[in-house]
A protein has these predicted regions:
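Long, contiguous binding/interaction regions
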Residues: 698-883
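Acidic, glycine-enriched active-site microenvironments
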Residues: 674, 693, 824, 828
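Short, basic/aromatic-enriched C-terminal tail that caps enzymatic domains
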Residues: 691-693, 878
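A short, sequence-level motif marking secondary-structure junctions
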Residues: 543-545, 693, 731-734
C-alpha cells in the first residue's frame, strides 16, 4: 500500500541517467535517446566520466557532482556496480531508482540500502516505464506511444514490447506503461493504489506471472476496481509453464477466485488481451447487459449470436415503437428483428437510418454494428455514416457502441476511422462478442460484490472448544484426524456428522454393529491411506454380523498385502445414512502457497482434481459469497443443481460453507480439511467421511489469509449514561438495512454537518461502500443496541487511512435523538485507540464552524482545532504516534 516515492517515479521533475553513453549499443545511450526523444519537460542529467556530453547534453562525472538531487535515477551501468551507485544516490538524497539489470545475489543488499535511505526501486531487470502525459520514456523501448487513459503494468519485458508494438500500429494511447521486472521493492499493489487515484487513468490492464503478497494485491485491486475496470492476464496456469517462468504462482483456480473476489476480470490469452486493450481504451461503461446487433449479412450476425449464447449473454428485445420506426426508415424487404439484417446490398444510408432510429430507443444497453465487405456499401463509407450518426445525435456520446468491420485490407481505413473517433473496433464477430462479454462479466462481478448479504440462520461457533480439541490432538502428536476424531470439532461449528465408532478388530466391529443396528458402513482407519476406496477400504450396506466379520477381515488382509508399511488403527463403524434421493458432494479446504486457504466445492471421486472438478473461493465467506460459490459450481457443472428427487438446497449448502469458512478462519492449526462425501438430503447436510490435517501454528492467525476477516477481537460491550448496554463492533456488510434505518433517524442538520451537503437519498451503492469495507484499509465501528424485537444502530465512527498508513481521515455520527449519552465520545475514543494501535501518526477530520458539539468534543480529546472562517471549515488533527 505504500505510496512513498511513487510521485517521484511516475511524475519526476528531473532525471539522472547513471552510465550514460555515446555508444549506440549501450543501455546508457538508448535510455538517453528515448528520454530526449520523448519530450520530457525537465532536466535530464547524464552521469559518466567517459564523455563531456551525451547527445548534446552536458554530462557529470559522478553522482556526487550533480548540481542538484534528481527525482529519478536510472542505473544503466554494469550490474556489479549497482550497490555502490545506489549508496551514492542515497547519500545524494535521490528517492527513486530504476535498476535495469542485476543478479539475484545482490537483491538483499540492494533492498537494505534502499530501505536505509527511504529510496524506492523499480526492477531489477525492468524494461523501464513510459508516462506519455509527462513526455517520459524511461525505457529501452524505441516505440513512441500516444497519450491515453489506459495504464498497463507488466511482469514481462517480452509481453511489454509486444503490446507496445501492437499499440503503435493502432495509434493506441496509454496513461502509464510500466514494466515491473523482478519487483524487488515496488510491486503491482503499490502501482494499483497510485493509479486508482490518477486522473489520467480510467482503466488498468495487468500482465502477471506471480505475486509476492497476495493479501496486499487483493486489497489494492479491490479498492481500485470500485472506480476503474481492471483486466488481468495471468500466465503460468500449467506446472510446465510455472517451471519455465521460475515461479510458483499457486493453483490457477485460486487466481480465478482472487480475481473475482477483488472485482477484476481475467482474460485467458493474448488474443483476448488485445481485444481487452481495445475495449478498455474506447468502450463506454455498460448500464446493462442487453445487446442490439445490426449487420449487412445473416452469417456474421449468426456467428456473433453463437458466441453470445455460448457466453450466456443477453439479446435485447425490441419494443413495438422501435419496430415501427425501423419499418418506416428501412426498405420493405428488411425483416425487423434483433439481429437487424440490413442485407448485403445495404448502403451507408441504410446503416445511418437504422442507427439513428436505434439511438432514440432505450431497448438495449450496447449496440454492435457489423459490416461485411460489399460493393453496394464500401466499408469506409459505412464507417463514416456511423460516425456521423453518432456525432450528430444527442445520445450518440452516451450509447455504448462496438464495431466489427470484417475483412482485412478493405476494412483497414474504416478501423482507423473508428479508432480516431474513439469507438472500439474488432476484426471478427466472435472477438467483438468476447470483448462485450468481458465488460458484462466485469459489471456482474462488481454488482455481486455490492449486493447486501442476507443474515444466515443462527450460526454455531464454539471457537474455544474447537481450539482445545485441536491443541490436544497436536499435543498427542497427531497430524491427521479421521471422522471419529474430528466430529467434535465440526459439531462446535454446527456441521453435522454421522455418529461414528472405533473398532479395534472385526470382533469389536460386529459388537458395535449389533448395538447400533443394521445396515452399517465399515471403513478402514489408517493415517497412511488418504483414499480408502483405493484399497476397497469402504464397505457399505452390511446387513448381518457375518457380513461385517467377513468385510472387516478381508479389508485388513488386503491392506497388509497392498500396503505392508501402512499403519492400521482399527476400523470405523457407522450406521448407514439414508441415501435415497440424496446427493453426494465434496467440500475440501487446501492451502495454496500464494493465496493461503481455499474452499473447494465439487462432487468428488477418487481421481479428484480441484482444477477440473471444483469451484473455488477464498475465505472468509458470507452468505452471498457462499451462494455465488454454489451457483458457480452448478453453472460450471462441478455439481448438479438437483438430485433425482429434489433440487439442491442452495441456501442450506451456503450456510454450511459459511460454517466451514468460519472454522478455517478461526483455527489456523487446520492445514487441510476433506469432507467426502457430504450427503445433501433436502435441507439436511451430513458429513459422512472427514479427514483433517493439522499442525502447530504460532503468530498472527490472519496472516495466512488473502483477505482480512471480520475482527471479532474488536467487539466491546459499553454502558451508556442512561444505563442501556450496546455493542461496539466493526461494521459488517449485513448491516446495510440497519444503517439505512439509522440514517433515517438523523436530522437533516446533523447529516449536513457530516457530509457538507444536503443528501436526499442514500443509494444502495452508497450504503455498500459504507458497510462492505476492507478492514486492512479502513475501519468503521457501529454502536448496536439489541432488544427482543430488533437490533438497531445508534452511532457510527469511521477512519480511512492513506496507503502509507500515516494519516487517517475520521468522521463520527450519532442518532440525533440520542445526543448527550456520551455515545459520540466513546465511539471516537475507540477509534483513536484503534488507529493508534495500528501505527498511524495522525488522525484528521473536518467539520463546520457552527458544529460546536464536535469542536468541543475534539478539544476534550486533545485534537488541534484550526477554525478557517473564510473557507467555512474547521480542521481537526490529533497526533497519535511519532513518525
Amino acid at each position: 500500500m505504500s505510496q512513498r516515492g511513487l510521485e517521484a517515479l511516475l511524475r519526476p521533475k528531473s532525471i539522472a541517467v547513471i552510465g550514460a553513453s555515446m555508444k549506440p549499443q549501450r543501455a546508457g545511450y538508448l535510455m538517453m535517446r528515448n528520454l530526449l526523444a520523448g519530450g520530457f519537460n525537465g532536466p535530464v542529467m547524464p552521469v559518466t566520466p567517459a564523455w563531456k556530453a551525451v547527445l548534446g547534453v552536458l554530462a557529470w562525472p559522478t553522482i556526487e557532482s550533480l548540481p542538484f538531487t534528481p527525482d529519478l535515477a536510472v542505473l544503466c551501468t554494469n550490474a556489479r556496480r549497482n550497490l555502490e551507485l545506489l549508496e551514492a544516490l542515497g547519500q545524494k538524497g535521490c528517492k527513486t531508482c530504476i535498476i535495469l539489470s542485476s543478479q539475484p545475489e545482490q537483491y538483499p543488499a540492494l533492498l537494505e540500502c534502499a530501505a536505509r535511505y527511504q529510496m524506492r526501486l523499480l526492477g531489477p531487470n525492468s524494461l523501464g516505464l513510459l508516462a506519455p502525459w509527462q513526455g517520459l520514456n524511461a525505457s529501452f523501448s524505441p516505440v513512441p506511444i500516444h497519450r491515453g487513459k489506459l495504464a498497463f503494468i507488466s511482469q514481462s519485458a517480452a509481453v511489454s514490447n509486444t503490446i507496445l508494438d501492437w499499440a503503435q500500429q493502432r495509434e493506441m494511447g496509454f496513461s502509464y506503461f510500466i514494466a515491473l521486472g523482478d519487483s524487488l521493492d515496488i510491486d503491482v499493489y503499490d502501482l494499483l493504489d497510485f493509479l486508482a487515484r490518477d486522473s489520467k487513468t480510467s482503466a488498468i490492464l495487468l500482465y502477471l506471472e506471480h505475486l509476492s503478497d497476495a493479501r496486499r494485491f487483493v486489497s489494492a485491486a479491490r479498492s481500485a476496481s470500485r472506480n476503474k475496470p481492471i483486466l488481468v492476464i495471468k500466465s503460468g496456469r500449467s506446472p510446465a509453464a510455472q517451471k519455465l517462468l521460475h515461479a510458483n504462482s499457486g493453483m490457477d483456480p485460486a487466481w480465478d477466485a482472487a480475481i473475482q473476489r477483488a472485482g477484476l476480470l481475467r482474460v485467458q490469452d493474448t488474443h483476448e488481451l488485445f481485444s481487452a486493450v481495445e475495449t478498455l481504451s474506447h468502450m463506454r461503461p455498460l448500464r446493462g447487459e442487453k445487446l442490439m446487433i445490426v449487420s449487412n449479412g445473416a452469417a456474421p450476425a449468426a456467428l456473433a449470436l453463437d458466441e453470445l449464447w455460448l457466453r450466456n449473454g443477453k439479446l435485447a428485445a425490441l419494443s413495438e415503437e422501435t419496430r415501427d420506426a425501423l419499418r418506416q426508415a428501412l426498405p420493405v424487404g428488411v425483416e425487423i428483428a434483433n439481429p437487424l439484417d440490413l442485407r448485403d446490398d445495404a448502403s451507408s444510408e441504410h446503416y445511418q437510418r437504422a442507427v439513428n432510429v436505434l439511438l432514440n430507443s432505450q431497448d438495449y444497453d450496447a449496440l454492435l454494428v457489423i459490416h461485411s465487405p460489399s460493393a453496394a456499401a464500401p466499408g469506409t463509407e459505412s464507417a463514416l455514416a456511423l460516425i456521423d450518426a453518432l456525432k450528430h445525435h444527442p445520445r450518440g456520446k452516451y450509447v455504448t457502441v462496438l464495431t466489427n468491420w470484417c475483412g482485412e485490407f478493405s476494412s483497414q481505413e474504416a478501423r482507423r476511422l473508428f479508432s480516431d473517433a474513439g469507438l472500439p473496433t474488432y476484426r471478427t464477430p466472435e472477438g467483438t462478442i468476447t470483448a462485450f462479454m468481458h465488460m458484462v462479466e466485469y459489471r456482474r462481478n462488481q454488482k455481486q460484490l455490492r449486493e447486501t448479504p442476507v443474515l444466515p440462520d443462527s450460526l454455531t461457533a464454539n471457537t474455544s472448544e474447537a481450539h482445545a480439541l485441536l491443541q490436544q490432538a497436536i499435543d498427542d502428536g497427531a497430524t491427521t484426524l479421521d471422522t471419529h476424531e474430528v466430529s467434535p470439532v465440526l459439531r462446535a461449528y454446527g456441521i453435522h456428522t454421522l455418529p461414528t465408532w472405533i473398532a479395534a478388530d472385526s470382533a469389536e466391529a460386529v459388537h458395535i454393529a449389533e448395538q447400533i443396528g443394521y445396515p452399517v458402513a465399515l471403513k478402514l482407519r489408517s493415517p497412511d491411506i488418504p483414499h480408502k476406496s483405493e484399497v476397497q477400504g469402504v464397505m457399505l450396506y452390511l446387513r448381518t454380523a457375518a457380513e461385517v466379520q467377513q468385510a472387516a477381515d478381508a479389508m485388513i488382509d488386503r491392506v497388509k498385502l497392498a500396503w505392508p508399511q501402512a499403519r492400521i488403527h482399527g476400523l470405523l463403524v457407522q450406521s448407514m445414512a439414508n441415501r435415497a434421493g440424496a446427493q453426494e458432494l465434496r467440500v475440501v479446504v487446501e492451502h495454496d502457497p500464494v493465496f493461503g486457504p481455499l474452499i473447494m466445492l465439487g462432487e468428488g471421486g477418487v481421481e479428484w482434481r480441484a482444477e477440473d472438478q471444483a469451484a473455488v473461493a477464498l475465505p472468509p465467506l458470507n452468505m452471498n459469497l457462499a451462494r455465488y460459490l454454489v451457483i458457480q459450481a452448478i453453472k460450471n457443472k462441478k455439481i448438479r443443481g438437483r438430485s433425482a428427487l429434489r433440487p439442491l438446497d442452495i441456501a442450506g449448502l451456503s450456510q454450511l460453507l459459511v460454517q466451514v469458512s468460519n472454522l478455517i478462519v478461526d483455527c489456523p492449526e487446520i492445514q487441510r480439511l476433506d469432507i467426502h462425501p457430504l450427503l445433501a438430503s433436502g435441507n439436511e447436510f451430513t458429513a459422512l467421511d472427514v479427514t483433517l490435517g493439522l499442525a502447530p501454528f504460532s503468530g498472527d492467525s490472519e496472516s495466512r489469509l488473502a483477505i482480512r476477516p471480520y475482527p471479532h477481537q474488536l467487539e466491546e460491550w459499553v454502558v451508556m449514561k442512561n444505563g442501556d448496554r450496546c455493542l461496539f463492533r466493526p461494521i459488517l456488510p449485513e448491516d446495510e438495512p440497519q444503517l439505512l434505518a439509522f440514517i433515517a433517524q438523523v436530522t437533516k442538520e446533523d447529516l449536513y454537518y457530516r457530509y457538507f451537503s444536503e443528501i436526499n437519498e442514500f443509494t444502495h451503492d452508497d450504503l455498500a461502500n459504507m458497510t462492505q469495507i476492507d478492514y486492512d484499509r479502513e475501519m468503521a465501528f457501529v454502536a448496536v443496541r439489541t432488544s427482543a424485537e430488533k437490533s438497531e444502530i445508534l452511532g457510527v465512527t469511521r477512519a480511512i487511512s492513506d496507503p502509507d498508513n500515516i494519516d487517517a481521515e475520521f468522521a463520527v455520527l450519532v442518532r440525533s435523538d440520542l445526543k448527550g449519552l456520551g455515545l459520540g465520545r466513546r465511539l471516537l475514543e475507540k477509534l483513536i485507540a484503534y488507529t493508534q494501535s495500528h501505527g498511524l501518526q495522525r488522525l484528521n477530520g473536518i467539520t463546520m464552524p457552527n458544529n460546536r458539539g464536535m469542536i468541543g468534543l475534539a478539544r476534550k480529546l486533545g485534537f488541534t482545532v484550526d477554525i478557517q472562517l473564510e473557507d467555512g471549515i474547521v480542521s481537526l488533527s490529533l497526533p497519535l504516534n511519532q513518525g
